[in-house]
Structure formats: C-alpha cells, structure tokens
From Swiss-Prot:
Its main location: membrane. The chain crosses the membrane at residues 71-93. Keywords: Cell membrane, Membrane, Metal-binding, Transmembrane, Transmembrane helix, Zinc. Its cofactor is Zn(2+). Binds 1 Zn(2+) ion per subunit. This is Anti-sigma-YlaC factor YlaD. Belongs to the zinc-associated anti-sigma factor (ZAS) superfamily. It is a single-pass membrane protein. It comes from Bacillus subtilis (strain 168). Anti-sigma factor for YlaC.
Amino acid sequence: MTCFLVRDLLPLYLEGDCKRETEHVIEEHLKMCSSCRDMYDTMAEPFELESEQAVEEAYLPEEELRFKQRYYGLLIMKAACWFGAAVAMMLIIKLLI
C-alpha cells in the first residue's frame, strides 16, 4: 500500500472504523515506513483545546466590544422608533375610520 493511501486512511484507522484487512495492511506499512509512523504518532497524541473564555478574549478586543454595544444599542433604538411609528399610524387610521 502506498504512503498516500495510508495517510488518507490514518484517521479511520485511529478511530477503529477500518475493516480488519485494512487495519492489518496499515499496521504492516507503519512497521516499514518511518514517515507514516511519525504521522501516525502525531495524530495519535492527544491535544488540549483552549478554553472557551480564552478564545473569546482573543477574538473580541475592547474596541470591538464597544462597537457592538453601540451598534446594537442604535439598532434597538431604531426598532423602537419604527414600532412607535407603526402604532401611531394604526391609531390614526382607527380614529379616521
């Protein structure tokens, strides 16, 4: 089996989703090919994900937070004005009819 195919199948092999024959062929290839074995070792190592708060802080600097507060504040004000105008129009129409 070529390195290309083994590298393509490594995620399935690690998850245990390969057939027995395929697992055997991959294991034999890993014994002979140090490059694929290194890739296997790298993929098999567990890794830590950053905490959600750390990621949030990295992507939301203070200026962006201020911008969002202003933007959504204005959006709410506009929506309230449009709602008020619609209610006023409905009252005027009701009084005229």
